[in-house]
């Protein structure tokens, strides 16, 4: 029997069992049951003392037991540490055992199962059916996984089954109550194993009057679940019938059930509503039908991982035991994407967009045509697929209703109602994007007619189908399989854990291969250490081009180069005075000669010390470097396979695999400094950042002041290994046109990147020189496994401060400046706690400054003068005219209760609002507020107690006898703008004039 593994899952009842859900070559589902065991690693003596004979035992052979506790001393009398060598056994038993001296207890039972049986979680196998016993049709018991799964075979594709759904509930207030508000709609997109797609919406007819139902005509109305026709677009039935159909669907063994925030709302709401109305439950059964559990969505609160606003990180999980993988897109995207908003409309707008050409249509409407000539190949095709159920389109921040649409394989024509938006220019190109349909549900429920119900059904179905497109857009299916294979975990757990748990699978595999056991004593003490080096920007505005060079995987390569690992750490020598330090360092260099050892000077761990030197043995590759090399080699392998892949399925899989190895490799450094991690090594973590700082400083010293003259590159200093010495050539021949002359100045650096300003505005020339410079740095300046990559040319760079800048980015693969994209890093444009007015103004002034820099006519002082004059005029004009609406000044924050003080003003503000309003703001909810003061209040130079001017803004809020407290907003805006300018004197003068105080200049 040939199978492809789809998901591994456990039943956690009285008799625990492990199950595999798979497909055979006929695309039929196959379930295999295994005995669930607890795994223990013990010494042979401990095994012999057990009073219970374990169900399974296997000798792991002689293994080195290495104590990785750090040995910190104040002199150079470093003692040689000899690891213990002992014969170890792996034992397994269906019930927990009491073991007095257990080793490797931190690893998961499921990981042991995969490794000892040589099973790849997402693999394809030719099963030996001699070890399978039929339980019931399609379900078997396996009594020997190792022999049954002995023959892996090349991967083959099978089709999967999916259910994407969304619900709407009647409500009067902000949120529906499960006790009083019925479900009005459920829309489903259901794909069976033959790839047939069903799209339908079930509407609660009890919300419609009999008069409205009489208008239903050909719309299917049913009374029982058995009457349901999944080919019908819309079905009318009672709420109980609707919920029972949902129960039937959720109890089916789909491969994936995908929702958007369904774990926290939709699924819980449907389940609870069903129980309230019928006393029935959604039940999941194991494939052997031996265990049934009621659907339950349980919460996992991690107070140790607090999110924005100090709220504990909460995740939601469905307790099913039937092999279906329930997936919440909201939780996944929130964890993996950095977006301004995680509402479905914002995510859809970010994911699905296409450039199109405008032309007039009837009745003042406009048609937009998109195809492979208006945007990149494939964009129109994807947009067309989403457009099939789309009802509204976003264009230039205006949401427009779709009047009609024509969809072709690689082209779309969509007519939009532009009356309340703007008048497009004929034959001009506009970017269309999707967002949430522009409808007011509360208004629709107030006048709930059949027409309204159908309109809402279209809206609901679009959201369900959006889930399908987002699932494909993010390539989640292949990422799940890739994560399962990489982390040696079941598919259903691949995204459940944090990096500290995900690393355990690959680490255990390596430890078994190298016959190594790492042990440490007691709880680890938390100690601080310095991070990466960030250079201060040399100036604010750049008229010349700036080259950006990044180290490839700096920290992983630092660990490999230094052989940083807890078991390769010889010792840490600390000194309390300068004389002691000099003597110790001199003796250490003699005792531990390079390159067999590396001495890493780090910042001291306490104030009573002046130095700390970590000594690492480089003679035999350590566990962490081996782990990293394995990850990087496999990533390179899959990147190569990705380039050679001929079909889209293979490309998606290889791309997901290389991505997973990139993520896990980059997580290792963080885990070395995380004391709860199995890889925790304080000395290794701080040595990693110390070497990293040396590498960025070294690159800066070689490039800052370099010159290109007559085809030769003259470096600023001799390329010298900062750890082991050795000089390289300072003058290097290049293949660059000898007529090109260029000077290089380092103007900023951050951890693993260097910003090099060149005395040229020519983008094409800068690109050519940068690519040649990349080759020279990698072949002559850098050494061993260190490499840099030319990332981009930045044009019209504006540096606000460290880690905050705006620029036009021309990627390394570009040929000229035509592909330039504006980016903002760490600035207010990317933040959620900044008003629209602030964002619009800062965008205006950055564009203005960028244009001025491009022109290159004005001096820095004149740029500053013109900018400050314009700013003062704009602010005073807005203050006098008050033209911008209140919504431009709204701010938002999350309501929570994790404040240190009981009388926190944010809490008091919400409590006051809740006491005066029926619709209370709940814990975890975001609310809008603004700064408001009496209308008669003149311009305020001195701003004090600004928290007292905060007012929560809801739909009913109006400025009655009040005005926006502009001065607060203007001061924040002016602070950011003066930090874009180089002249502190002029900036201070304006600030003192407007606000009676000096500005805060960013460090």
Residue ranges and their predicted role:
Residues 721, 729, 771-774, 778-1003:
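C-terminal, non-catalytic extensions of nucleic-acid polymerases
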Residues 754-771:
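Catalytic palm subdomain of template-directed nucleic-acid polymerases
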Residues 45-53, 59-100, 211-340, 346, ...:
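Conserved DEDDh/DEDDy metal-dependent 3′-5′ exonuclease domain
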Residues 1-253, 279, 395-398, 461-462, ...:
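DnaQ-like (DEDDh/DEDDy) 3′-5′ exonuclease domain used for proofreading
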Residues 225-236, 305-322, 384-385, 396-397, ...:
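Intrinsically disordered, low-complexity acidic Ser/Thr-rich regulatory segments
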Residues 404-405, 745-750, 790:
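Short beta-strand
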């Amino acid at each position: 029997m040939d199978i492809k593994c789809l998901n591994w899952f456990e039943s956690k009842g009285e008799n625990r069992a492990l199950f595999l859900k798979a497909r055979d070559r006929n695309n039929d589902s196959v379930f295999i049951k295994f005995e669930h065991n607890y795994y223990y690693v013990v010494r042979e003596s401990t095994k012999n003392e057990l009073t219970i004979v374990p169900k399974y035992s296997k000798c792991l052979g002689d293994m080195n037991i290495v104590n990785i506790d750090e040995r910190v001393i104040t002199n150079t009398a470093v003692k040689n540490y000899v690891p213990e060598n002992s014969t170890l056994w792996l034992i397994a038993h269906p019930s927990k055992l009491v073991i007095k001296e257990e080793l490797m207890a931190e690893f998961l039972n499921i990981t042991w199962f995969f490794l000892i049986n040589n099973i790849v979680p997402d693999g394809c196998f030719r099963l030996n059916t001699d070890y399978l016993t039929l339980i019931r049709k399609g379900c078997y018991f396996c009594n020997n996984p190792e022999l049954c799964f002995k023959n892996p075979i090349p991967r083959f594709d099978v089709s999967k089954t999916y259910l994407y759904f969304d619900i709407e509930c009647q409500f009067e207030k902000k949120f529906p109550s499960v006790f009083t508000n019925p479900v009005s709609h459920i829309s489903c997109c259901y794909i069976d194993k033959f790839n047939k797609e069903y799209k339908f919406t079930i509407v609660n007819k009890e919300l419609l009057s009999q008069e409205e139902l009489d208008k239903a005509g050909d719309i299917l109305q049913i009374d029982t679940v058995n009457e349901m026709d999944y080919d019908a677009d819309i079905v009318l039935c009672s709420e109980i019938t609707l919920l029972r159909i949902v129960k039937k669907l959720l109890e089916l063994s789909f491969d994936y059930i995908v929702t958007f925030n369904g774990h926290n709302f939709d699924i819980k709401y449907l389940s609870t509503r069903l129980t309230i109305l019928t006393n029935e439950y959604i039940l999941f059964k194991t494939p052997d039908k031996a265990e049934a559990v009621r659907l339950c969505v349980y919460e996992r609160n991690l107070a140790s991982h607090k999110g924005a606003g100090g709220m504990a990180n909460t995740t939601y999980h469905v307790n099913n035991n039937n092999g279906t993988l329930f997936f919440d897109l909201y939780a996944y995207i929130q964890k993996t994407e950095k977006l301004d908003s995680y509402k479905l409309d914002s995510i859809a707008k970010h994911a699905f967009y296409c450039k199109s050409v405008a032309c007039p249509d009837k009745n003042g409407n406009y048609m937009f045509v998109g195809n492979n000539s208006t945007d990149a190949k494939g964009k129109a095709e994807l947009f067309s697929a989403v457009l099939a159920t789309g009802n509204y389109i976003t264009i230039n921040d205006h949401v427009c209703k779709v009047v009609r649409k024509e969809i072709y394989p690689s082209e779309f024509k969509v007519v939009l109602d532009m009356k309340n938006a703007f008048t497009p220019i004929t034959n001009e190109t506009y970017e269309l994007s999707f967002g949430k349909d522009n409808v007011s549900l509360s208004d629709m429920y107030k006048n709930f007619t059949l027409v309204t119900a159908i309109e809402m059904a279209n809206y609901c179905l679009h959201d369900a189908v959006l889930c399908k497109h987002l699932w494909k857009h993010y390539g989640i299916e292949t990422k799940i399989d890739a994560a399962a294979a990489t982390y040696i975990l079941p598919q259903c757990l691949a995204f459940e854990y944090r990096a500290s748990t995900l690393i355990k699978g690959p680490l255990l595999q390596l430890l078994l291969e190298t016959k190594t056991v790492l042990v440490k004593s007691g709880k680890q003490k938390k100690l601080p250490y310095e991070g990466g080096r960030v250079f201060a920007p040399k100036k604010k505005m750049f008229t010349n081009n700036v080259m950006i060079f990044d180290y490839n995987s700096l920290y992983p390569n630092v660990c490999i180069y230094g052989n940083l690992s807890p078991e390769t750490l010889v010792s840490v020598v600390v000194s309390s005075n300068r004389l002691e330090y000099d003597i110790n360092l001199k003796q250490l260099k003699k005792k531990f000669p390079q390159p067999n050892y590396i001495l890493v000077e780090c910042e001291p761990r306490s104030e009573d010390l002046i130095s700390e030197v970590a000594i690492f043995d480089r003679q035999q590759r350590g566990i962490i470097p081996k782990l990293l090399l394995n990850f990087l080699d496999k990533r390179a392998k899959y990147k190569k396979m990705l380039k050679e892949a001929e079909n889209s399925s293979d490309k998606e899989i290889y791309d997901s695999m290389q991505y997973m190895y990139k993520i896990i490799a980059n997580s290792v450094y963080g885990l070395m400094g995380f004391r709860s991690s199995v890889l925790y090594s304080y000395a290794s973590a701080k040595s990693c950042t110390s070497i990293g700082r040396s590498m960025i400083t070294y690159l800066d010293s070689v490039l800052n002041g370099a010159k290109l003259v007559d085809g030769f590159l003259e470096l600023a200093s001799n390329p010298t290994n900062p750890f082991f010495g050795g000089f390289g050539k300072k003058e290097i021949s290049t293949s660059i046109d000898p007529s090109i002359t260029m000077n290089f100045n380092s103007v900023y650096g951050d951890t693993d990147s260097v910003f090099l300003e060149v005395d040229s505005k020519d983008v094409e020339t800068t690109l050519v020189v940068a690519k040649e410079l990349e080759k020279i740095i990698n072949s002559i300046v850098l050494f061993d496994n260190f490499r840099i990559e030319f990332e981009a040319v930045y044009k019209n760079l504006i540096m606000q401060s460290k880690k905050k800048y705006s620029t036009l980015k021309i990627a390394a693969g570009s040929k000229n400046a035509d592909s330039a994209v504006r980016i903002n890093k760490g600035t207010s444009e990317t933040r959620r706690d900044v008003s629209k007015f602030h964002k619009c103004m800062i965008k205006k002034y950055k564009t203005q400054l960028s244009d001025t820099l491009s022109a290159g006519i004005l001096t820095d002082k004149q740029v500053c003068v013109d900018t400050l004059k314009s700013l003062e005029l704009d602010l005073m004009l807005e203050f006098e005219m008050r033209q911008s609406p209140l919504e431009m000044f709204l701010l938002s924050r999350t309501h929570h209760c994790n404040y240190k003080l009981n009388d926190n003003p944010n809490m008091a503000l919400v409590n006051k609002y809740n006491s005066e309003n029926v619709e209370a703001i709940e814990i975890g909810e975001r609310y809008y507020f603004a700064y408001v003061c009496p209308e008669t209040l003149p311009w305020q130079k001195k701003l004090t107690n600004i928290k007292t001017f905060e007012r929560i803004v809801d739909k009913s809020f109006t400025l009655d006898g009040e005005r926006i407290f502009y001065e607060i907003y203007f001061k924040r805006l002016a602070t950011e703008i003066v930090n874009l300018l180089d002249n502190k004197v002029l900036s201070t003068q304006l600030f003192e004039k407007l606000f009676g105080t000096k500005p805060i200049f960013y460090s």
